[in-house]
Amino acid sequence: MKLNKLPLEVVGNRQQFITLDAHTEGEPLRIIISGYPEILGETILEMKEYVAQHLDRYRTLLMHEPRGHADMYGALITRPVSKEADFGVLFLHNEGYSSMCGHGILALVKVMCETNTILLGCEPRVIKIDAPAGLITATASLDEEGRVQASFENVDSWAEAINCSVMVEGLGEVNYDIGFGGAYYAYIDADALGLSCGRENVAQLIDLGRRIKHAVMDSHPLVHPLESDLSFLYGTIFISKEVTEKAAHSRHVCIFADGEVDRSPTGTGVAARAALLYAKGEIGLNQPLVIESIVDGKMTVSALREQDFHGKKAIIPQVSGRSYITGQHQFIVDPDDQFQDGFILR
């Protein structure tokens, strides 16, 4: 006996979702193709608010177990809201919604091109994407072997605070910087704390990342120059000079949302890190840096140009990394299933 090919025809009137899954440097992305009702809102931030207020059940259904897991990440494609954009996107995770996602942008560009949703020719193709953090300019091209290569210019990124400190339970005084790269992150020197940024230490990094995040949130209020919806600390990024590849500048381990661990170096995180290094005079313009992740994934970031952003001395970072399609899914919701809305069990 053989099952039919996807999509399966299921008996009964059951809600269904079609997704295309991918990863960027090890970090998953579940791209939601169909299943959501109409999303209302005139701006991408209004759409984000509408989804959070009225459709959040679908986030937990697709991100949490048994269909997902505690570290799943999602992208919900929307209609464009700006004249320049090709499409819009909302980003989902275990706790809620993010303002921007670099690994998600890279995976979306790769998927759009490899499925011929966006056609590529001999010349690089510029793709504009509406995200809650702003309009993202991505570029797709084909290498000599015909493989899709993706990069993006991030939103204005800047050093928000340098050389700060906070008391953290179990650690004492911890020094940190804060950078914005589409979201705010607190950067911690793991080497100074004697912390390993290897995968064998992930449980401790999650625990300390959560504690540091909440300590910084309580002591260092953040105010975005334009959007109050972006005025929050998204995560903690541990940085280390202990790398596996000589060409790498450093390693990032990002703990974000509700203890979620980024398998990639974090696209918005490397963008904000470049802004911090630029502000400290440690890098110049057009100086590419390779940054590793906890699973040895790599992203390259550089500061393309400097510009003012409502009083902030900002840079426009360029970020690149490798993405791969991993599968297509047809998720079915049985109305009798007590776990139909999902659950988290670490």
Swiss-Prot record:
Active site annotation, chain numbering: 101
Record's catalysed reaction(s): trans-3-hydroxy-L-proline = 1-pyrroline-2-carboxylate + H2O
Alphabetized InterPro entries for the sequence: Pro_racemase_fam
Highest taxon, organism lineage: Bacteria
EC numbers for this chain: 4.2.1.77
Enzyme's top EC category: lyase
Native source organism of the sequence: Shewanella woodyi (strain ATCC 51908 / MS32)
Entry keyword annotation includes Lyase: yes
Keywords: Lyase
A molecular function GO annotation: trans-L-3-hydroxyproline dehydratase activity
Family: Belongs to the proline racemase family.
Protein name, UniProt field: Trans-3-hydroxy-L-proline dehydratase
Residues the entry annotates as binding substrate: 102-103, 262, 267-268
Cited function: Catalyzes the dehydration of trans-3-hydroxy-L-proline (t3LHyp) to Delta(1)-pyrroline-2-carboxylate (Pyr2C) in vitro. Displays no proline racemase activity.
